[in-house]
Amino acid sequence: MKKITLFLAACFMLAPASQAETQPAVTFNWAHTVDGATSAGDNIIGMVKASGGDCYVATTWGTNSGASQVNLWFDGEQVTGADGAAIVGSPYTGTSKNGNMFLQKVSNAGSIVWNAYTRKGDIAHDKSHIVSTKDGGLLAVLKTRAWVAEAGYDNLVEYVDPTGHVTTIKDMGNVSGEYRYLVLKIAENGSLEWSRLIAGKVEKRKKGFTKDNMSVYGVAVDEDGGIYLTGNFRTEMYLKKTDGTVETLTAKNTTEWDGDSQGVVGDLFLAKLDKDGYFVKSLTAEGIAASAFLDKVVYADGNLYFNGRIKGKTGNELTLGGKAVSVTNDCENLLLASVSAADLSVGYVKTITPVGSKKTIHNNGCQWIDGYVYFTGSSMGGLTGLYENSKGQHKGYILKMDPATGEVVKSAIRLDGGIGKFYGVYLNGSTMYAFGYDMTGGALLVPVDAATLSLGTAITLCKYGVVAAGCTPIIDGENMVVANRGRNTATLYGTDYSYTGNKNWAMIYYSYKLAGTSVGIGTTTAESQKGKTDVYTLDGRLVKSAQSYDKAVGGLAQGVYVIGNKKVTIR
């Protein structure tokens, strides 16, 4: 192993000084499409790495029974259930659609291990999430509502597992059309183990009832199975404890919300649940903000790192966990923070003020890689002291944060092309890429100089028109799995593969092998360890199991792992 490590080091020395100036050499592996028949129902919830080299992919497809648009197609073939009949989503009749989840376990070679889906309840894809768990399964945190009389106003979700077994999750206190959250624990075979309900308070306001009163924007899991939710709420939140009682979180800024679901108001929150989904502890801000959100979160080394957005309110001072929050009142400021996972005590809170005529920022990715936190998203303006954007459009950004101090040590924004966004980065040694989209080009892979974050010339991985949607990619050794939405025709880079003839828009997820990626081993003395070896990320996610140490570390991306109960750095 030492000889291999030295050889790889020599190879890196011979590599070009700036990877960002080199056209990325990528090789197509495989691709899949998920396609419903409605015009706006196909979207991505997320994808995560699972055990044994597999991954979980959660998408949504729309149904409208009035237009006979209730079925689903995968790779152009109609999807059937365990009984051999075509699967059918929730009934719905109207001008929009009902969102149904399609959950798949996929091997790293692209073969489908199993399918599961929902057929009651309207899933909000953009505020729902999946995250893998230590036991090889996953959590699905779903924002859902019962709004269809034919499906039953008390049926939040009906989950159909890979064997065809149906579980209906009811909420007798639900108000028709009210969004609530369900935390679902799903086993590695796709069966549903348990569900927990998180509800809010519905009140009559100027523009209607407060039925969209909370949103979860980020989810993380620690090595003990503890669950962390970040987001925004606007009335009250009710979370169940192990003793059967309910914890109530009360928002401070409630009077300014008129009930409009698109209103930019409310309070930020961080909620800790135990491994069984019961409430443990929470963190909210002290003082009143005009609006406050916690967005993406990642767990590492006993701490939570997250970003957010916060806008001040005249005459009000803000603190988070006793730490002062410096914030302006004219726009949402970018918030970066560190919190202890054990007791939710705050290590630091940093804010960065946007600059320019347009200052909106979207936070879409948060990754722990090689001892740093990488944030990605889009920004309409610049960020004070980091980068400028005078284009007046959303442009993809990357921030590299030192987790010890909260300081942004490097930053980048891509000003080329049209409206754009980054969802995440790939880093292995000196090889780095950013994945996102450009609405004038498609889904992009942009080479990045790992030392400076300078951006190279992008290639278009997927040409699909002007529809923009995606999620943080899966990093699987030297392979990367990405997803985006497209119209009914798309082509992929470096292959003759394409899809045509889909009903309307479709989701496509696909895998590429990235060139120039190699793995070296450092800071471990367990090289010759024999027997079954499990590999975990520092947030407790099982990456894979192997029959020897050498097989366990083979193919791992750069980063810090727990291998055989020891912390190991892959360089």
Q: Which stretches of residues belong to each language-model region?
A:
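A sequence-level/structural motif corresponding to short, flexible coil/turn segments enriched
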Residues: 21-518
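Glycine-centered signal
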Residues: 15-17, 236, 562
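C-terminal outer-membrane/trafficking sorting elements
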Residues: 520-571
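Cross-kingdom Sec-pathway N-terminal secretion signals
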Residues: 5-6, 20
